[in-house]
Amino acid sequence: MALSKRELDELKPWIEKTVKRVLGFSEPTVVTAALNCVGKGMDKKKAADHLKPFLDDSTLRFVDKLFEAVEEGRSSRHSKSSSDRSRKRELKEVFGDDSEISKESSGVKKRRIPRFEEVEEEPEVIPGPPSESPGMLTKLQIKQMMEAATRQIEERKKQLSFISPPAPQPKTPSSSQPERLPIGNTIQPSQAATFMNDAIEKARKAAELQARIQAQLALKPGLIGNANMVGLANLHAMGIAPPKVELKDQTKPTPLILDEQGRTVDATGKEVELTHRMPTLKANIRAVKREQFKQQLKEKPSEDMESNTFFDPRVSIAPSQRQRRTFKFHDKGKFEKIAQRLRTKAQLEKLQAEISQAARKTGIHTSTRLALIAPKKELKEGDIPEIEWWDSYIIPNGFDLTEENPKREDYFGITNLVEHPAQLNPPVDNDTPVTLGVYLTKKEQKKLRRQTRREAQKELQEKVRLGLTPPPEPKVRISNLMRVLGTEAVQDPTKVEAHVRAQMAKRQKAHEEANAARKLTAEQRKVKKIKKLKEDISQGVHISVYRVRNLSNPAKKFKIEANAGQLYLTGVVVLHKDVNVVVVEGGPKAQKKFKRLMLHRIKWDEQTSNTKGDDDEESDEEAVKKTNKCVLVWEGTAKDRSFGEMKFKQCPTENMAREHFKKHGAEHYWDLALSESVLESTD
């Protein structure tokens, strides 16, 4: 069912609000399309097909809400109209004109008597207070209305007290009472009292309702004209004459009354404050309206989203409007202080660079750093120790070498014999000679294969000759079909050809099955590949130590980590400024491949986004000296692995890096790499 233009206008704000809630922003195109669907009377399916290009997945939910709103609007309008009709009916029952006219026995219609005829004939005019509008009911008017209703009820009681009165009798005021008074009977006093009380109660309710309506209309200045008309119409309906307002009072403005001091006063002499209209800018008007709108948004109760099935409290709801950002002015002299701080920092760095350059030329810097790396010695160079370190293990503590005649017990365990310890084989060196494999040439491989096949064929022929195995079927092909079968091929060529092709397919199938039986499974291939990459390190672990100046590029880090994992190498990468140490442990073949990766395949001198920032801060001369490169510090063997899976460790200080290596028992790797870095920086 299509909707009228008025109904569509009432529905439009709700559709705009729903579209903004579904899409997150207002879209006039979707609103127009939805109004078009409702206006044409489409059903849910057609409306969903029409709106699907705009809303996608939210179409069905939006269409359901749209049709629910249409149904609610219809029901609300229906209930509103029914309530208006019932209210009018109730007022009509109390103050309306009588519709039922009693008839005489002859059937002649009598003239209808107005209900408040006596009131209409009265020329009395009720003056209203000057402060109230002529269309509004005053207290005196309401009192007059109550008195008129009481008189009308008294008159009706008099009419009902006669038997068959000539005048027409009105029907009972209450429509809810189905019983009618018979015309020819005398009304009882109890019934008359009941009728009077009901009429007075309804009149009181109607007066209260009218006063409440007038009070609400008074709050809306735009509707005061309509309110005046309604009030005047009600006064005429009740038989109360409205206050007469002269035409000159309506057309002419209110006279201005001034006192002796020139102030505006009313008729009673009280001072009146006039409203002064001052011109203002549009910007100020918009600002006031904006503040009022914000205040309304704050006062507006927020929708209860927690009752929604799809409400997620973790998701923050974005505000409908972006908060206005104010200007932030900088204090005077702020940037001058920043510039002065930067100049001071640059001068300090320049001074430090000059001192460092002078220290490099004199060698003070290098010797200082090497002294920090080298282990501390208890004795100075050239001093003779009192006891050698190898004797300290057998001499007891507190032994005094300065004593002239030491006791014999002090030499317990010392004899005049020389102890020769047992000879042990080195843990990693293997003196067994390595035999080189003998590889045949292609010609020798073919000859050996022919001999092997010939021997196997002779063995099969011997078994057939002795009757141990049945003779094999002749190997028939299409090319030797006539030569092998002869007469049979001539008699039934089709049958023979089918037989030959079946033999060929059988041989092909047997060949493929043999190949599949020899083929390794996926698990076996995986194990074979891992076995090929994993080398035997029972005789010793091969170790390589590399030093890289800059290892901040994530691509190069990934190459190191990925290749170490693929080659089943273990180790560690310690990241420190200008000294990045890479230690790898594994077999000799894997070390060979990893060495080629570090020294040849990776281009260390490539400029990256990370290294450019470091090089820009340094001078051109230092940038040339500190070109990124990788150096092999040391390679050798050890009995066991010192590290686990390849990992990266960030060490801001040298002590932290050395402690990390010391924890794994390999601090000498760090000392060696750092000393080479120090010596290289002095060159």
From Swiss-Prot:
Modified residues (Phosphoserine): S164, S619
Protein name: U4/U6 small nuclear ribonucleoprotein Prp3
InterPro entries linked to this entry: Pre-mRNA_splic_Prp3_dom (IPR013881), Prp3 (IPR027104), Prp3_C (IPR010541), PWI_dom (IPR002483), PWI_dom_sf (IPR036483)
Principal subcellular localization: nucleus
Domain of life of the native organism: Eukaryota
Subunit structure: Component of the precatalytic spliceosome (spliceosome B complex). Component of the U4/U6-U5 tri-snRNP complex, a building block of the precatalytic spliceosome (spliceosome B complex). The U4/U6-U5 tri-snRNP complex is composed of the U4, U6 and U5 snRNAs and at least PRPF3, PRPF4, PRPF6, PRPF8, PRPF31, SNRNP200, TXNL4A, SNRNP40, SNRPB, SNRPD1, SNRPD2, SNRPD3, SNRPE, SNRPF, SNRPG, DDX23, CD2BP2, PPIH, SNU13, EFTUD2, SART1 and USP39, plus LSM2, LSM3, LSM4, LSM5, LSM6, LSM7 and LSM8. Interacts directly with PRPF4.
Mediates interaction with SART3: annotated segments: 416-550
Gene Ontology terms, MF aspect: identical protein binding
Cross-link named Glycyl lysine isopeptide (Lys-Gly) (interchain with G-Cter in SUMO2), sites: K139, K244, K252
Encoding gene per record: Prpf3
Key word Nucleus present: yes
Compartments where located: Nucleus; Nucleus speckle
Native source organism of the sequence: Mus musculus
GO terms under cellular component: Cajal body; cytosol; nuclear speck; nucleus; U2-type precatalytic spliceosome; U4/U6 x U5 tri-snRNP complex
